[in-house]
Amino acid sequence: MSETARTTIDQSEVDRFSAMAAEWWDPTGKFRPLHKFNPVRLAYIRDRVAEHFGRDPKSRQPLEGLRLLDIGCGGGLLCEPMARMGADVLGADASEKNIGIARTHAAGSGVRVDYRAVTAEALAEAGESFDVVLNMEVVEHVADVDFFMTTCAHMVRPGGMMFVATINRTLKAAALAIFAAENVLRWLPRGTHQYEKLVRPEEIENPLVASGLEIADRTGVFFNPLSNQWNLSKDMDVNYMIVAKRPI
């Protein structure tokens, strides 16, 4: 198959999330787990970006002047806080409905975000480039992981960085992130995740390294039911995040 014919889009996944688009900003709705997850991933992104670019993470706008892409942005749960931290944000999603919800919410919140209903490959073909690329809870929903990671890596500027967050393909993840989360606790609608589409860390890292990026950090993330919060962890068996950087 030629590169131009390849696609990262799994239309069934786009349709699934489009059907839930109206609930993106409801903290008690179908995206409640992402609302719970947001504080730990926001802090992780802010701190790693500030460290890399020599910024003060406690300043009001530590991302000022940086161009940031949130690919698969959904309703904008990450885009808006990134914009508030000073970044020039492009939020991209294959779902027109998601983008519509994101635009409406940003307008009501007074936050400036450039939202586009566009694919990663279309952005890359247009020559777009960014200081920071976010792939957060997206890769397990795409059609071609290797092509997706390679495509996104090409949009990382020299000296820039990429964040990836996803779910590991392990029996532990199948038990906790799929069976328990979707069937027992009902945190997510059934069918949100499929075991065969979960992604192991090396399946993220290999195409990034092949595209000239260097792996800079890895961390697991776990949910503590006692504190009702997500925390960073050394255990990457279920949820995890990876940071990669492109040398100058």
UniProtKB/Swiss-Prot annotation:
Top-level EC class: transferase
GO MF annotation terms: 2-polyprenyl-6-hydroxyphenol methylase activity; 3-demethylubiquinol 3-O-methyltransferase activity; polyprenyldihydroxybenzoate methyltransferase activity
Domain of life from the UniProt record: Bacteria
GO biological process assignments: methylation
EC numbers: 2.1.1.222, 2.1.1.64
CDD domains the UniProt entry points to: AdoMet_MTases (cd02440)
Pathway the protein contributes to: Cofactor biosynthesis; ubiquinone biosynthesis
Reaction(s) catalysed (UniProt annotation): a 3-demethylubiquinol + S-adenosyl-L-methionine = a ubiquinol + S-adenosyl-L-homocysteine + H(+); a 3-(all-trans-polyprenyl)benzene-1,2-diol + S-adenosyl-L-methionine = a 2-methoxy-6-(all-trans-polyprenyl)phenol + S-adenosyl-L-homocysteine + H(+)
Keywords: Methyltransferase, S-adenosyl-L-methionine, Transferase, Ubiquinone biosynthesis
Residues that hold S-adenosyl-L-methionine according to the record: 41, 72, 93, 136
Role according to the record: O-methyltransferase that catalyzes the 2 O-methylation steps in the ubiquinone biosynthetic pathway.
Family, as annotated: Belongs to the methyltransferase superfamily. UbiG/COQ3 family.
HAMAP family: UbiG
Name listed for the protein in its UniProt record: Ubiquinone biosynthesis O-methyltransferase
Gene name as annotated: ubiG
